[in-house]
């Protein structure tokens, strides 16, 4: 057995005797996150708070256009924190497509936790394009027969269209003296992070915590102990990373927030005074984009869907 596989049976045995917010077998399809999902279940059982709702919200295009034979409608399903970026990019793409093809593209947009969005697409939300937090979520849609195998080879960077790293956002002046991952396990620290059941970003947060132990010489037992202790400091689990930010920034809960660094930079660009630390031991947060083959063929939107995906690069 590999280093990652050895503790799997032990952790699953623990899981069978404890209550969980999500089933372990529901995580087995995550690419490269099989063991992490199992350990995460154990850690979440220690969380002191409840979960947020897991519904996603569908939003109309910024500038709706009445349907006509000259219009094409494209449905984009994405994870929560990409909303601001897409709302800036989409009008530019619409303008370019109109100029090049004399056709107006009308976007339907849906944003929510990556896990929730994945389930919605599999359950019938007819996305033409999906931009999700994890390659494993895209692979779930592939396994459901909606995306053709090899999707990651059809575009640059193996399908990865956005990247970031994990950042620790603190209160002004950093009163808890947060310097690195290990500080999140202090009894006096309350941590805000999203719900891994519904948020791909929250799974990346977990990977950051886990990786901080493994990359500094710890083994799986130490990593499990650490993440379990950290999750005891989590009072509430919002449904996605954007809601986690609101819980921390607008509702004033918690001493520290784990979030994407690009989200923090966006807040600063909007005039927010945000203090944060990027831990030295970190993880590359890679977010894939893919055309949903079955749906674009049904809708007759393959050309524009592929054009939009290429435009994102």
Mark where each language-model region is.
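Short, low-complexity disordered leader/linker segments with a strong preference
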Residues: 1-72
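A bilobed periplasmic-binding-protein/Venus flytrap-type ligand-binding module shared by bacterial periplasmic
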Residues: 165-174, 286-303
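Early extracytoplasmic/lumenal segment of secretory-pathway proteins
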Residues: 47-144, 154-155
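Extracellular/periplasmic juxtamembrane helices and adjacent flexible linkers that interface
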Residues: 2, 49-53, 294-313
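Alpha-to-beta junction loops
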Residues: 124-130, 188-189, 250-256
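Ligand-binding cleft/hinge of the Venus flytrap
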Residues: 91-101, 182-247
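A conserved helix-loop-strand patch within extracytoplasmic ligand-binding domains
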Residues: 142-215
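Ligand-binding pocket segment of bilobal, Venus flytrap-like solute-binding proteins
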Residues: 216-281, 288
């Amino acid at each position: 057995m590999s280093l990652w596989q050895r503790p799997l049976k032990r952790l699953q045995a623990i899981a069978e005797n404890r209550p969980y917010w999500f089933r372990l077998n529901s995580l087995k399809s995550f690419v490269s996150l099989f063991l992490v999902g199992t350990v995460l279940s154990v850690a979440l059982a220690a969380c002191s708070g409840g979960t947020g709702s897991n519904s996603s919200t569908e939003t109309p295009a910024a500038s709706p256009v009445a349907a006509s034979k000259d219009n094409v409608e494209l449905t984009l399903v994405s994870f929560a924190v990409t909303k601001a970026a897409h709302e800036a990019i989409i009008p530019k793409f619409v303008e370019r497509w109109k100029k090049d093809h004399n056709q107006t593209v009308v976007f339907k947009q849906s944003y929510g936790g990556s896990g929730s969005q994945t389930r919605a697409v599999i359950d019938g939300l007819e996305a033409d394009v999906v931009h999700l937090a994890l390659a494993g979520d895209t692979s779930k849609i592939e396994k459901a027969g909606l995306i053709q195998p090899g999707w990651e080879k059809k575009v640059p960077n193996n399908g990865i269209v956005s990247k970031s790293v994990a950042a620790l956002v603190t209160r002004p002046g950093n009163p808890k003296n947060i310097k690195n991952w290990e500080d999140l396990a202090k009894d006096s620290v309350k941590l805000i992070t999203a719900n891994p059941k519904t948020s791909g970003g929250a799974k990346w947060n977990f990977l950051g915590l886990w990786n901080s132990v493994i990359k500094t010489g710890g083994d799986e037992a130490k990593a499990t102990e650490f993440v379990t202790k950290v999750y005891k400091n989590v009072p509430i689990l919002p449904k996605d990373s954007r809601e986690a930010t609101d819980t921390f920034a607008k509702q004033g809960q918690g001493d520290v927030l784990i979030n994407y660094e690009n989200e923090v930079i966006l807040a600063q660009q909007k005039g927010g005074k945000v203090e944060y630390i990027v831990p030295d031991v970190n993880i590359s947060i890679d977010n894939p984009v893919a055309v949903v083959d079955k749906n674009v063929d049904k809708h007759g939107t393959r050309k524009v869907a592929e054009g939009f995906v290429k435009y994102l690069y």
